[in-house]
Swiss-Prot record:
Subunit-structure text: Heterodimer of a large (LacL) and a small subunit (LacM).
Function: Component of a beta-galactosidase.
UniProt superkingdom: Bacteria
InterPro entries: B-gal_small/dom_5 (IPR004199), Bact_Beta-galactosidase (IPR050347), Gal_mutarotase_sf_dom (IPR011013), GH-type_carb-bd (IPR014718)
Name under which the protein is recorded: Beta-galactosidase small subunit
PANTHER family found in the cross-reference section: BETA-GALACTOSIDASE
GO CC terms: beta-galactosidase complex
Reaction(s) catalysed (UniProt annotation): Hydrolysis of terminal non-reducing beta-D-galactose residues in beta-D-galactosides
Enzyme Commission no: 3.2.1.23
Originating gene: lacM
GO biological process: lactose catabolic process
Length: 318
């Protein structure tokens, strides 16, 4: 790997891979199984390493047709997932995983135009399957993310499939280009394509907290935050992080709670005060149904067949 004058500095740490440019510094962890820091223009955007997500908080219709009893293993898979392997490629060339002491071979002055880090996860379902998430970082700081689910015979229907980002503080607003309002695969006909702004992180006030706030057929979404956890920034300004489709639109939800937090609450008073932003970027979403709430399943066309492969990509930029 040549030491050329490129903008992307590559730092080979003992347990992390650092990538640095003029306005950003990223850390990809070999221990947590994902990126653990995306610091852009001095602001940290990650509170937890992004991980594949498979679960949504059950809806009234889900509970009525006993979907959680049929597909409950995906809740465990959403909470606990093992990173099976990690590969690193510098300018298209795969290198031995640069953990200690392998990283001692590098000078500390390496640079590259493009770096790809791929994490392979294994679910704790029965039977098991794998998910691959690759991050390709360019010298500009743009990150292209590819998420691949490998279908496996014998697995029950999925609630959702995507990648979950947890950000350190609540978003002030988000702007997206897609369909108006809350939409699901079987609730899209009334959505009007356009650009929309949502203030704060609204949660639909159902009697029992459940999944909400999904936006289908999205071209891009920009999350804006002002508050930070860094006490050195006394007057933080609002900045945004953009997530944009690559080949096909995605779905997303942007809430102050994880699916598990919503799932555990039986009334809104049981939900904690909002402290984080939970952004789910989704390549597949189960419909909500509604034929009735006491037994009828979601129509087959709006279910997610877990035996089939799934893949979607998006770009992160600032």
């Amino acid at each position: 790997m040549a030491n050329t004058n490129k903008r992307l500095a590559v730092i080979f740490g003992d347990v992390t891979l650092g990538l640095k440019g003029p306005d950003f510094h990223y850390l990809f962890s070999y221990q947590t199984g994902g990126p653990e820091s995306l610091r852009i223009q001095g602001k940290e955007w990650l509170y937890r390493s992004p991980k594949p997500t498979f679960w949504r908080a059950t809806t009234d219709n889900d509970r009525g047709n006993q979907f959680p009893l049929k597909s409950g293993m995906w809740l465990a898979a959403d909470q606990f997932i093992a990173c099976q392997s990690i590969t690193v490629a510098i300018d298209g060339q795969t290198i031995p995983l640069p953990i200690a002491p392998e990283n001692n071979r590098y000078s500390g002055r390496e640079t590259a135009q493009e770096v790809t880090v791929t994490y392979t996860y294994q679910t704790i379902t029965t039977p098991q399957t794998t998910v691959e998430v690759s991050y390709t970082i360019q010298a500009s700081g743009k990150i292209r993310v590819a998420v691949t689910y490998h279908g496996q015979a014998g697995l029950p229907s999925l609630p959702v499939f995507g990648l979950r980002f947890v950000m350190p503080t609540p978003a002030t607003r988000f702007i997206y280009q897609g369909l108006s309002g809350e939409t699901y695969p079987d609730r899209m006909a009334g959505g009007i394509a356009g650009e929309y702004e949502v203030t704060g992180l609204p949660v639909t006030p159902y009697l029992v907290p459940q999944d909400c706030g999904v936006h289908m057929a999205t071209d891009w979404v920009t999350i804006y935050r002002q508050a930070v956890l860094d006490n050195c920034l006394h007057e933080p300004v609002e900045t945004g992080l953009k997530f944009k489709m690559v080949d096909q639109p995605f779905a997303f939800s942007c809430l102050p709670y994880t699916a598990e937090e919503l799932e555990n609450a039986t009334h809104h008073s049981e939900l904690p005060a909002p402290h984080r932003t939970v952004l789910n970027l989704l390549g597949a979403v189960r419909g909500v149904g509604g034929i009735d709430s006491w037994g009828s399943d979601v129509e087959v066309a709006y279910q997610i067949d877990a035996t089939q492969d799934r893949h979607f990509e998006f770009e992160i930029s600032f």
